[in-house]
Design a protein with these regions (language model features):
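Glycine-rich oxoanion-binding loops at beta->alpha junctions
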Residues: 1-30, 35, 68-80, 272
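Short, ordered loop/turn segments at secondary-structure junctions
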Residues: 3-5, 33-36, 48, 53-60, ...
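Accessory alpha-helical/coil subdomains and C-terminal extensions
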Residues: 27-32, 40-42, 70-91, 95-194
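Glycine/threonine-rich beta-strand-loop-alpha-helix active-site module
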Residues: 46-83
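Short glycine/threonine-rich loop-to-helix capping motif typified by GTGT followed
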Residues: 160-163, 207-215, 247-254
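Catalytic, metal-anchored helix/loop core of enzyme active sites in primary metabolism
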Residues: 165-177, 203-221, 225-229, 267-269
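Phosphate-binding loop/pocket of nucleotide- and phosphate-handling active sites
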Residues: 182, 235-272
Length: 272
């Protein structure tokens, strides 16, 4: 994925317009997440013929129920959690699985529920450390070893994001890293139980796509071409229910689609 933001490059938009004209390109199909489609929306505002396709493992684009890549990432994370259960039980320790999710906790929520996690921490709901310790101790009292799934963007109440360093990419994002290790240290200090962290990182972004993602991407592609033929510029193809529809790029990127509190409360029935 490119981390270059043409909107902050001098003459970036003009350069894009010139290159498209020089190459005889009639339409641009932008495939990506909030940054890619955010740029696509601005390009559309400047009169460039653009159609968007939602591709991000974070599933955080508005206007679509699912983005392709999300189901594959959840499957990879779930398989990892399944494996972590074995070593957690054999060594009687706390296992923390840190997954991607800067602003939205969809991967943690879905993989945590599917993998039978005993606690899930997401960016949308700042957590109380004492509550997390309660989940851990409750699990050990039942003679089981706890598994916690944590989004990289999760943070404690009255706390700050755990970052790798202070540098920003061209879209203004900090490099997140370390919430899992930090939490493991807190658990060991407060409960005396051994805690280990597995950071899945970029393994979530590759590999063989699931059947769901293959079908979804195929349907998105077909409908993106139809939108081009219709000259329905400035739109993103989206999945709503079982239908592929078109929504304005500005709508898709205006507000991030985050995990509703009700979904997190639903999952919390299995915590501890």
């Amino acid at each position: 994925s490119s981390r270059t933001n043409p909107l902050i490059v001098d003459g970036g938009i003009e350069s894009i317009e010139r290159n498209l004209n020089d190459l005889g390109i009639d339409a641009l199909i932008a495939i990506g997440g909030e940054d890619t489609l955010g740029v696509a929306s601005v390009l559309s505002d400047h009169g460039i013929s653009v159609i968007g396709v939602p591709k991000t493992i974070d599933n955080d684009l508005s206007g679509t129920d699912y983005t392709f890549g999300f189901d594959t990432a959840v499957t990879i994370a779930t398989e990892a959690i399944d494996r972590l259960h074995t070593t957690a039980e054999s060594h009687h320790r706390v296992l923390i699985c840190e997954v991607m999710g800067r602003h939205a906790g969809w991967i943690a929520l879905h993989s945590g529920m599917a993998g039978g996690a005993n606690g899930i921490l997401i960016p949308e709901v700042p957590f109380e450390l004492n509550e997390v310790m309660g989940w851990v101790e409750s699990r050990f009292r039942s003679h089981y070893s706890p598994i916690l799934v944590v989004s990289e963007g999760a943070l404690p109440k009255d706390g700050e994001l755990i970052t790798k360093d202070a540098t920003l990419d061209s879209f203004g994002h900090v490099k997140l890293s370390g919430i899992g290790e930090w939490l493991a240290g807190q658990i060991e200090q407060r409960t005396g139980k051994e805690a280990r962290t597995t950071v899945l990182g970029h393994v979530q972004r590759g590999g063989t796509p699931t059947a769901f993602d293959r079908v979804l991407a195929t349907r998105f592609g077909l409908n993106a071409i139809r939108a081009v033929k219709d000259k329905d510029w400035g739109k993103m193809v989206a999945l709503q229910g079982t239908d592929i529809v078109r929504v304005p790029l500005a709508t898709a990127t205006g507000v991030l689609k985050t995990v509703p509190l009700a979904r997190y409360v639903e999952a919390s029935a299995f915590f501890g």
